[in-house]
Regions:
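Extended, charge-rich alpha-helical interface modules
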Residues: 1-78
């Protein structure tokens, strides 16, 4: 994976995390209730899932594609 693509994906996942965190914070601080989304716990659960998925993707990128893909070909057999 080239550096530009890696940087764009990293920023994308980081922005997804920040967006979800901001929405959770808004629910919490402002007691926002959206008429079509009455299930606050369900909405927060969905936002937490978005955070978890984005963090997982960042972790996979770090594991397999950081350091110019040097480690992506190294697999250990247990």
């Amino acid at each position: 994976m080239n550096d530009k693509l890696r940087m764009v994906l990293k920023k994308r996942y980081e922005s997804e995390i920040e967006d979800a965190k901001y929405k959770i914070q808004s629910f919490n601080e402002n007691n926002i209730i959206i008429p079509e989304h009455i299930d606050i716990t369900g909405e927060v659960d969905k936002l937490l899932l978005k955070i978890a998925e984005a963090e997982d993707k960042l972790a996979v990128m770090r594991l397999h594609y950081d350091q110019k893909e040097a480690k992506s070909t190294e697999y250990k057999i247990l």
